[in-house]
């Protein structure tokens, strides 16, 4: 019987973001920060896809957008980073789902924190608790939590389909 398993890629597409990969077969998660060199980043994604030979690759990327208070260069940077990720994923014929920041953060009961730095520190602490074997940084904490969110949501969906006893 063939051993089937899934990879989950969680992506924080911000310039200071990262990529987390959950390997269902090994029950292991790894993460890297976003690289400035797109060729290198694309090669890393390719090595993940071709190296693991998973039966299914599920990609979830944070749905980012600019705010009216953002400067034009900042808004452009948001769109460019997301577009770069979309291009890399498309080059490997990978579809994606998006998740709003509020959606995945609510999964971890993150309070509403207006200050971005304080919110990132809060998220980093959650990720450090969940992934004690990983050196969690501000760059990769969101990606780790997004990948874990996707893993947990798929677990819940799978069990709902089977039907739970009440």
Regions inferred by a protein language model and the residue ranges of each:
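Phosphate- and other anionic-substrate recognition elements at nucleic-acid/protein interfaces
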Residues: 1-166
């Amino acid at each position: 019987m063939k051993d089937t398993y899934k990879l989950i890629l969680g992506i924080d597409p911000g310039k200071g973001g990262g990529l987390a990969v959950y390997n269902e077969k090994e029950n292991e998660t790894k993460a890297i920060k976003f690289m400035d060199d797109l060729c290198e980043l694309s090669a890393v994604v390719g090595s993940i896809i071709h190296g693991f030979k998973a039966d299914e690759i599920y990609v979830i990327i944070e749905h980012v957008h600019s705010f009216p208070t953002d400067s034009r260069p900042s808004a452009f940077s948001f769109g460019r980073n997301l577009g770069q990720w979309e291009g890399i994923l498309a080059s490997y014929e990978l579809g994606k789902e998006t998740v709003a920041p509020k959606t995945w953060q609510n999964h971890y009961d993150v309070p509403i924190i207006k200050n971005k730095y304080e919110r990132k520190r809060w998220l980093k602490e959650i990720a450090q608790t969940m992934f004690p074997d990983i050196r969690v940084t501000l760059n990769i904490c969101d990606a780790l939590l997004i990948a874990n969110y996707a893993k947990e949501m798929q677990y819940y969906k799978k069990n709902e389909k089977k039907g739970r006893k009440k």
